Amino acid sequence: MDMGNQHPSISRLQEIQREVKSIEQQVVGFSGLSDDKNYKRLERILTKQLFEIDSVDTEGKGDIQQARKRAAQDTERLLKELEQNANHPHRIEIKNIFQEAQALVKEKTVPFYSGSNCVTSEFEEAIQDIILRLTHVKTGGKISLRKARYHTLTKICAVQEIIEDCVRKQPSLPLSEDVHPSVAKINSVMCEVNKARGTLIALLMGVDSSETCRHLSCVLSGLMADLDALDVCGRTEIRNYRREVVEDINKLLKYLDLEEEADNTHAFDLGQNHSIIKIENVLKRMREMKNELLQAQSPPELYLRSKTELQGLIGQLDEVSLEKNPCIREARRRAVIEVQTLITYLDLKEALEKRKLFPCEETPPHKAVWNVLGNLSEIQGEVLSFGGNRTDKNYIRLEELLTKQLLTLDAVDPLGEEKCKAARKQAVKLAQNILSYLDMKSDEWEY
């Protein structure tokens, strides 16, 4: 239809659809809960558009009625997705774990408010356990769940960094106040810094509604000014003491700056952690090798060289410092599985090539197991290349293919032959490992 002659009702429906389309990505990526301001804003916009669509006069014309129906369906689909994102069982699981962390923080930060810098091992271990549980929440590759898990993890990891710093680096002093008049003031400031540390942790976890980032930042800047004004000339030990307290203040200010930017940036970016960077460098090299190996038709001369380098990558991952951080532990675990899966793929390819070159007499059951192993090798190559989520047709197809191979193995009767029994057991384990790897791939890890 010529745009100049288009019916006004059709034009209005198209305009509404453009408005709905403009917020679609916000809905798809919505990672909050149904009581969030942003949820209510998106819900209000979409509901308003539904009313607007409903008010369009179709004049009884079939084409306008169809256009109105399509526009309403698109809008209702987004409303439904918004509701599902906010109420997804795994989103609720993330919320419940975060609430546990909030309760823990409320209980364990009390000593900070008296000026103490004491962090119990119980608090430290409980935070680590919460982070570990969050890393195991399945997202199925769903954007909203990945964002929710990431945002929650970064908050709690920031708290963990703060309390780890307390454990790792207590100020080497305080000095006795008899040493110098400035020491009493530094001791007083250090007490205030410890109180601010507790307040910051409470702020990060959303359990202190009486404080704001801006006010706490002003308090810390004031303490910094007090320290700068002290005369500590010629007293190295006092100057060092002051420097340690200044460093503590700067660290807390850094967290405050990140928290204020949190809505617009990747605050507390785990990707900047030096251990994560090492893991990512290993994965980058592994992916380069994987692409080369999967593209090659039949490169047996490449297998040995590649396996040697891949074993070296496993060694590099073994050397990564975990820093008592479950996020790093999970990232390393997944990286080891990635590299080990590629090694297993090469081992199977080698075994299949060797069987072709040096055929030997096999019983029918043993031959059936080898046929399944050949199928598994082909499927594993596809799984290694997979990059989607569980709702993808390719995921479902690969899962069905692997299940079929397991059923085929289950039907093989070894007829009491030990060698065939062992081969079947190994093939079953391989198929299960590939299924597990496919599941992991559908839930890509984010930093």
Swiss-Prot record:
Please tell me in which tissues this protein is expressed: Detected in brain, lung, stomach, liver, kidney and testis.
What highest taxon heads this organism's lineage?
Eukaryota
Q: Which GO terms describe its cellular component?
A: cytoplasm; cytosol; inclusion body; junctional membrane complex; membrane; mitochondrion; nucleus; perinuclear region of cytoplasm
List the Gene Ontology MF annotations in alphabetical order. Answer: adenyl-nucleotide exchange factor activity; protein kinase binding; protein-folding chaperone binding; ubiquitin ligase inhibitor activity; ubiquitin protein ligase binding
Q: Which keywords belong to this entry?
A: Chaperone, Repeat
Biological process annotations from GO = Golgi organization; negative regulation of neuron projection development; negative regulation of oxidative stress-induced intrinsic apoptotic signaling pathway; negative regulation of proteasomal ubiquitin-dependent protein catabolic process; negative regulation of protein refolding; negative regulation of protein ubiquitination; protein stabilization; regulation of inclusion body assembly
**Domain BAG, chain residue ranges per copy:** 9-86, 95-167, 182-260, 275-350, 365-442
User: Where is the signal peptide, in residue numbers?
Assistant: none
Record's subunit section: Binds to the ATPase domain of HSP/HSP70 chaperones. Binds PRKN. Interacts with HSPA8 and JPH2.
| Function as written in the Swiss-Prot or TrEMBL entry | Co-chaperone for HSP/HSP70 proteins. It functions as a nucleotide-exchange factor promoting the release of ADP from HSP70, thereby activating HSP70-mediated protein refolding. Has an essential role in maintaining proteostasis at junctional membrane complexes (JMC), where it may function as a scaffold between the HSPA8 chaperone and JMC proteins enabling correct, HSPA8-dependent JMC protein folding. Inhibits both auto-ubiquitination of PRKN and ubiquitination of target proteins by PRKN.
Q: What is this protein called?
A: BAG family molecular chaperone regulator 5
Q: Give the organism, scientific name.
A: Rattus norvegicus
This protein's encoding gene: Bag5
